[in-house]
Amino acid sequence: MERNTPDPEPSERAVLLYGLQRTGSNYTRQLLLQNFQHLCFCNQGYSRCLPTHKHFRLYDEKSAIPDVRFYNNFRYSSFQDFREHAGEIAGRGINIFIIVVKDPYSWYLSYKRHARKNKYPYFKGSLNAHYLIDYNLFYRKWLDFSMEAPEEVILLRYEDLIEDLDASLGRICEKFSLQRSSGALENPSKVNMNREFTRARSAYYKEKKYLELISERDRHVMQHLLDPELISGLNYQIIR
């Protein structure tokens, strides 16, 4: 099995980062690498079906996985079982799990574009309910794990990074006792193939302009499809 994860130095902290596609996982990884010392991300170089991949579908309802490239048959009875299996594959113990979350409405619009581009199962002209079911299940499992192991798992909202980056980094630093890099706070404006993060894009999230792009019909369906307990647990709101 190919591994691209470098062997960590003794002082490094091993991290696994997760999030659905289009939640800002690449941005978050780069942000943390630029602002904290001695982090080793252990997600690199693994197949999508393995629990060390950043988009791994952890949930038990495997038939709900919307794309065959992410199919897997791994089920875990507890966070400890998952952590041990992921650590076995990564080749070392891991006790920092960072989960990137995005508002389901802005995420859905972005993921829909991403799905068309990457030829995921997609229905034109109607709400792609299977994406929202994937969202519910993906983050429900991680929310449960965060309550089971609050000292090891943190759910990090993409919008909080945009709204108050310093406070968000401070929360991560305090939770995991990380060491901040010297110098001014760094915020990458562009990562890999993503578009540059401009003031207009910042306003798009801060002012929730994405809601204007969702039809009344689709909002009505999303209202009934999104898991209200999950959305509340992530500190978002269902639009009614």
Predicted regions and their residues:
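Short acidic alpha-helix initiation/capping motifs at coil-to-helix transition points
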Residues: E84-H85, I162-A167, T198-S202
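PAPS-dependent sulfotransferase catalytic core
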Residues: H53-L58, L185-R240
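Glycine-centered secondary-structure boundary/capping sites
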Residues: Q37-C40, G93, R116-K119, D160-I162, ...
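PAPS-dependent sulfotransferase catalytic domain
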Residues: M1-G183, I214, D218-R219, H224-L226, G233-Y236
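Short, functionally important structural connectors and interaction interfaces within domains
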Residues: V15, V153-I154, K206
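Short, surface-exposed acidic
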Residues: F41-Q44, S177-S189
